[in-house]
Amino acid sequence: MSPSLTWHDVIGQEKEQPYFKDTLAYVAAERRAGKTIYPPQKDIFNAFRLTELDQVKVVILGQDPYHGPNQAHGLSFSVLPGVPAPPSLGNIYKELVTDIPGFQRPNHGFLQSWAEQGVLLLNTVLTVEAGKAHSHANLGWETFTDKVIAALNEHREGVIFMLWGSHAQKKGRIINTERHYILKAPHPSPLSAHRGFLGCKHFSQANQLLQQQNQQPIDWQPKLPAVE
């Protein structure tokens, strides 16, 4: 891949597509109608802002944003500082404690330090109405995030995709396993984590795969930003 390729180069043209304009117009109209939509407008595309195309080492695919106040900020599974870790993230931490030597469960759920190291925290749907899970499914976001996965598949090599649950695994069918690595497990939700997410060792496996490619492993201990 040419290291100069950016998200703008490979998916920028999506902004001109009718489906994309329709999706953004729907979200804007819902906000104008007084509905609370998460995440805030400025945060919808945070995953791409924090993890540029040529920096992506790992992709963790989520479904849609958290739908409670002050949780979602554009990164899958992550919540803003000061908000308790939701149950799925609690199970991710539980797995990290057993998988990564020295990992200590943080008292927050802010995963931006992962994104800054090359972990693309991508939800397949990028907005949600407050209190209504999956309310923005089938608007058009899925088409956009399929294009994102296709761009990674085509323009990068050796990316590690963590696909948790059937939704993510279906989404990942287009990934060429001769060019990339796929780690599959049940979803970390309390409904399914005990069926094999806990014990999957995806985080240590990802670091082994990165080291085999002479890449810096991920420091999975989430860090809060230093207070200025």
From Swiss-Prot:
Q: Which reaction is the catalytic activity of this chain? A: Hydrolyzes single-stranded DNA or mismatched double-stranded DNA and polynucleotides, releasing free uracil
GO terms, biological process: base-excision repair, AP site formation via deaminated base removal
Q: State the PROSITE patterns in the record.
A: U_DNA_GLYCOSYLASE
Question: Is-annotated flag, keyword ATP-binding?
Answer: no
Compartments where located: Cytoplasm
Transmembrane regions listed in the UniProt entry: none
Q: Keywords assigned by UniProt?
A: Cytoplasm, DNA damage, DNA repair, Hydrolase
Q: Main localization of the protein?
A: cytoplasm
What does the record give as EC number? Answer: 3.2.2.27
Instruction: Determine if Methyltransferase is one of this entry's keywords.
Output: no
Active site at 64 (proton acceptor)
Q: Name one GO molecular function term.
A: uracil DNA N-glycosylase activity
Single GO cellular component term: cytoplasm
Family, per entry: Belongs to the uracil-DNA glycosylase (UDG) superfamily. UNG family.
Job description of the protein? Excises uracil residues from the DNA which can arise as a result of misincorporation of dUMP residues by DNA polymerase or due to deamination of cytosine.
Q: Which PANTHER family match?
A: URACIL-DNA GLYCOSYLASE (PTHR11264:SF0)
Query: What's the protein name?
Result: Uracil-DNA glycosylase
| Species of provenance | Yersinia pestis
